[in-house]
């Protein structure tokens, strides 16, 4: 099963992806983790990304797609994968479609974790306070959420039009949300 897990910061994507990885026995591919590991490994794409990040710029879609293509060529993804952190915009969604078409394996589903803004702000601000991060104020969190919503809304529409978007309530205990995802996926 080839899945994308979408949701705003604080929605529990990483937590749910880890749970889904265990349940479905397919790898969780976090583009953030992938980017960091490529940089640490000193791969050609990692070196390009490191140079871009050192200048304070965002890593290009082309570099991310190259890293993802490399990762999807590994044998552990034959049975599927859970992709987290990508796509973040419409051009990335189209690029992912093209990449998966190249492999002959389109997405089966896109799970959208839906969590109200006030709950997200509470989760992130609480996590930031516990970690001693002063930059995640409620106002800063709301701004990040707005940026996410602005860039991701078209992606959600893109997958909804294709009939593969599954909206799941992301509020509740870990096991409750995991159960909702399993039901939505028919597992």
Curated annotation (Swiss-Prot):
Annotated region described as NMP, given as residue ranges: 30-59
Top EC category: transferase
GO-annotated cellular components: cytoplasm
Binding site for AMP: 31, 36, 57-59, 85-88, 92, 133, 144
UniProt xrefs under SUPFAM superfamilies: P-loop containing nucleoside triphosphate hydrolases (SSF52540)
Entry's localization field: Cytoplasm
Superkingdom field: Bacteria
Entry keyword Acyltransferase: no
Catalytic activity: AMP + ATP = 2 ADP
Region (LID): 126-136
Keywords: ATP-binding, Cytoplasm, Kinase, Nucleotide biosynthesis, Nucleotide-binding, Transferase
Pfam family, one: ADK
Record GO terms (molecular function): adenylate kinase activity; ATP binding
UniProt cross-references to Gene3D superfamilies, sorted A to Z: P-loop containing nucleotide triphosphate hydrolases (3.40.50.300)
Residues involved in ATP binding: 10-15, 127, 172
Pathways per UniProt: Purine metabolism; AMP biosynthesis via salvage pathway; AMP from ADP: step 1/1
PANTHER family cross-referenced by the UniProt entry: NUCLEOTIDE KINASE (PTHR23359)
Known partners and oligomeric status: Monomer.
Swiss-Prot/TrEMBL domain comment: Consists of three domains, a large central CORE domain and two small peripheral domains, NMPbind and LID, which undergo movements during catalysis. The LID domain closes over the site of phosphoryl transfer upon ATP binding. Assembling and dissambling the active center during each catalytic cycle provides an effective means to prevent ATP hydrolysis.
Family (UniProt): Belongs to the adenylate kinase family.
NCBIfam families the UniProt entry points to: PRK00279.1-3 (NF001381), PRK14527.1 (NF011100), PRK14531.1 (NF011104), PRK14532.1 (NF011105)
General function of this protein: Catalyzes the reversible transfer of the terminal phosphate group between ATP and AMP. Plays an important role in cellular energy homeostasis and in adenine nucleotide metabolism.
Record's protein name: Adenylate kinase
Organism: Xylella fastidiosa (strain Temecula1 / ATCC 700964)
């Amino acid at each position: 099963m080839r899945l994308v897990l979408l949701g705003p910061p604080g929605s529990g994507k990483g937590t749910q992806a880890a749970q889904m990885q265990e349940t479905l026995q397919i790898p969780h591919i976090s583009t953030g983790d992938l980017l960091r590991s490529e940089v640490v490994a000193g791969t050609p794409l990692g070196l390009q990304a490191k140079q871009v990040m050192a200048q304070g710029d965002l890593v290009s879609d082309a570099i991310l797609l190259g890293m993802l293509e490399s990762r999807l060529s590994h044998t552990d993804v034959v049975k599927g994968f859970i992709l987290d952190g990508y796509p973040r915009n419409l051009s990335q969604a189209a690029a992912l479609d093209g990449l998966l078409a190249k492999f002959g394996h389109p997405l089966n589903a896109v799970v959208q974790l839906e969590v109200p803004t006030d709950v997200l702000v509470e989760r992130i601000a609480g996590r930031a306070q516990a970690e001693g991060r002063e930059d995640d104020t409620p106002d800063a969190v709301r701004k990040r959420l707005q940026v996410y919503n602005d860039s991701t809304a078209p992606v959600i529409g893109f997958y909804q039009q294709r009939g593969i978007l599954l909206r799941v309530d992301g509020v509740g205990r870990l096991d409750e949300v995991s159960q909702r995802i399993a039901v939505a996926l028919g597992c």
